[in-house]
Amino acid sequence: MQIYLVGGAVRDTLLGLPVTERDYVVVGSEAQTLLDLGYQPVGRDFPVFLHPQTKEEYALARIERKQGKGYTGFACYAAPDVTLEQDLLRRDLTINAIAQDQDGQLYDPYGGISDLNNRVLRHISPAFSEDPLRVLRVARFAARFHHLGFYIAPETLALMRKLSRSGELNHLTPERIWKEIEKVLSGRNPQIFFEILHDCEALNVLLPEVDALFGIPARPDWHPEVDTGIHVMMALREASQRSEQLAVRFATLCHDLGKAQTPAHILPSHHGHGERGTPLIRELCKRLKVPNDCRDLAILVSELHSLVHTALQLRPATMLKLFDRLDVWRKPERLSQLLLCCQADFYGRQGFAEREYPEPEYVQQAYDAAVAVAVKPIVEAGYTGEAIRLQLSRRRIFAIRDVHCRWNDK
């Protein structure tokens, strides 16, 4: 029995990155041997075991053959006669097919070290196109390692495009798609993931609402980049630099979905796009089973981001309605989330990096003034029932008006 460290742990060590988990492949053994040694079986579809002490994963070397649709349509053969090279051959990319034995010796039958040094994401064999999930995985690796200069080999991108056109992506479950999106939105440079999916024609299958934004024109004075899809990618990059919150990044991705449905006769203006985006967000989130907090913030940002951009022109009563719609009195974190998305939207435009954007500061000050209005004096003044709410709203409007006047006097 021979044991090798494989996959991400070897790759990340060679890249000088921290290793968070270790996976091993076991060659020349069988399931009963591992069971006798106290390993715990955890793989339902594949022979995977947990080490009795470290709880790290150990998998028997195996061969996979395509026999059905989707990423689960594989027959697995695991036996003592499966070699290390055969096991590594089934993996997606050369950089993930490097093994290391217990003495530290590296095994690299498919040129992974060379591709690591040259910053190339390259598939190992034509069998790459048998697994539709690999389209998402490669795009995610491209995003994850973008800061290191990695790019996808042209022949691999061509296979990804072929796979996207084959219909295989339709067999991915909503849960699996969201899991990949969640991973990429939680990491570095998430915009790269969506740009690559657009380039390889997978985005129109997986997230047609986002893909539809590419090619939609916007006013060049407000969006010098013109293309709405490009703007959303720029905004997502900004959001990822300003916040690690999944909900903020997802809401930024979805904030302009309504622009794809702007009537042609009013283009390149997009009046009402926030409201048009709401049903699209609901449908997307229902289809992919997106968590409720991500869905709810995305809807609010779609509806309200244009109001924040014009906050200094809003009447105090309208500003209070914005706060009420956010339910900031019970969920104050929503305001900071909305403002982060609006900042990403504003600065996610060509040539806007040095522009002033005072509106978020004004909105925050207006909220601080409104939330400071106390209920106790209203009750002590003799108001009851609905009259308390009306008087509270009235006093909050006055507080917002004071802030508005101070800003106008600047």
Curated annotation (Swiss-Prot):
InterPro entries: CCA_bact (IPR012006), HD/PDEase_dom (IPR003607), HD_domain (IPR006674), NT_sf (IPR043519), PolA_pol_head_dom (IPR002646), PolyA_RNA-bd (IPR032828), tRNA_CCA-adding_enzyme (IPR050124). Mg(2+) binds at E21, D23. One of its GO terms (molecular function) is magnesium ion binding. CTP binds at G8, R11, R91, R137, R140. Its cofactor is Mg(2+); Ni(2+). It comes from the Bacteria. PROSITE patterns: HD (PS51831). It catalyses: a tRNA precursor + 2 CTP + ATP = a tRNA with a 3' CCA end + 3 diphosphate; a tRNA with a 3' CCA end + 2 CTP + ATP = a tRNA with a 3' CCACCA end + 3 diphosphate. ATP binds at G8, R11, R91, R137, R140. GO terms for biological process: RNA repair; tRNA 3'-terminal CCA addition. Keywords: ATP-binding, Hydrolase, Magnesium, Metal-binding, Multifunctional enzyme, Nickel, Nucleotide-binding, Nucleotidyltransferase, RNA repair, RNA-binding, Transferase, tRNA processing. Its EC number is 2.7.7.72, 3.1.3.-, 3.1.4.-. Belongs to the tRNA nucleotidyltransferase/poly(A) polymerase family. Bacterial CCA-adding enzyme type 1 subfamily. A single active site specifically recognizes both ATP and CTP and is responsible for their addition. Catalyzes the addition and repair of the essential 3'-terminal CCA sequence in tRNAs without using a nucleic acid template. Adds these three nucleotides in the order of C, C, and A to the tRNA nucleotide-73, using CTP and ATP as substrates and producing inorganic pyrophosphate. tRNA 3'-terminal CCA addition is required both for tRNA processing and repair. Also involved in tRNA surveillance by mediating tandem CCA addition to generate a CCACCA at the 3' terminus of unstable tRNAs. While stable tRNAs receive only 3'-terminal CCA, unstable tRNAs are marked with CCACCA and rapidly degraded. Monomer. Can also form homodimers and oligomers. This is Multifunctional CCA protein. It comes from Tolumonas auensis (strain DSM 9187 / NBRC 110442 / TA 4).
